[in-house]
């Protein structure tokens, strides 16, 4: 669970987040809804420590207990990120890495696994998002946009996160593929009891995915 309490954030004197409060629950797809420019992305970035808030609290129920993001050091924020998966508007894959190597990247950065365990975990995550094995060794440019998004989801869950942040996850996808991605995010959220936060202005996606 994440508790946002009375959060304030301004840029150059312009208030973007004005005493925002909300609870984001485990095992559910929690929606941040609003038109473009309403502050959705600012709130999400504030919740993962990419923006420093001007006031209020953002409290995570981490594996080590409750932690207030507002009082964390830079090192503590990095430690928190080990429990956070992130899915960006674009798939944001590394063009120079294969599909499997992209999923292994967070494991290389943050885990103490052996090389064999990293490969096994990456392949498990790719299978979980229904990627065909023949695609594991392909480059991102060799697969479709929908498949790229699947790879991005596999990478986001590689570290077995407690929290999954999705910024416009259906951006650039056709309606049919969007439904598939929505269902995949829902299934993973419930299966692993993840606290998932989705930022969207797409009403069709909101009705399909949100709890």
Regions found by a protein language model. Name each.
Residues 48:
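Helix-to-loop junction immediately C-terminal to a conserved catalytic motif
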Residues 139-143, 147:
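Conserved ABC ATPase signature
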């Amino acid at each position: 669970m994440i508790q946002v309490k009375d959060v304030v954030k301004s840029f150059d004197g312009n208030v973007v987040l004005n005493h925002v409060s909300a609870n984001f629950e485990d095992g559910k797809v929690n929606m941040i809804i609003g038109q473009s420019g309403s502050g959705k992305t600012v709130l999400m970035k504030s919740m993962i420590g990419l923006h420093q808030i001007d006031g209020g609290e953002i409290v995570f129920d981490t594996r080590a207990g409750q932690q207030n993001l507002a009082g964390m050091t830079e090192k503590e924020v990095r430690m928190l990120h080990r429990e956070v998966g992130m899915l960006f508007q674009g798939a944001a894959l590394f063009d120079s890495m294969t599909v499997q190597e992209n999923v292994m990247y967070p494991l290389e950065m943050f885990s103490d696994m052996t090389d064999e365990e990293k490969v096994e975990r990456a392949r498990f995550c790719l299978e979980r998002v229904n990627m065909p094995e023949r695609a594991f060794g392909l480059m991102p440019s060799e697969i479709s946009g929908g498949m790229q998004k699947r790879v991005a989801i596999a990478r986001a869950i590689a570290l077995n996160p407690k929290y999954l942040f999705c910024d416009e996850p259906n951006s650039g996808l056709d309606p049919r593929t969007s439904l598939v991605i929505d269902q995949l995010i829902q299934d993973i959220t419930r299966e692993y009891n993840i606290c998932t936060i989705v930022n969207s202005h797409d009403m069709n996606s909101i009705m399909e995915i949100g709890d």
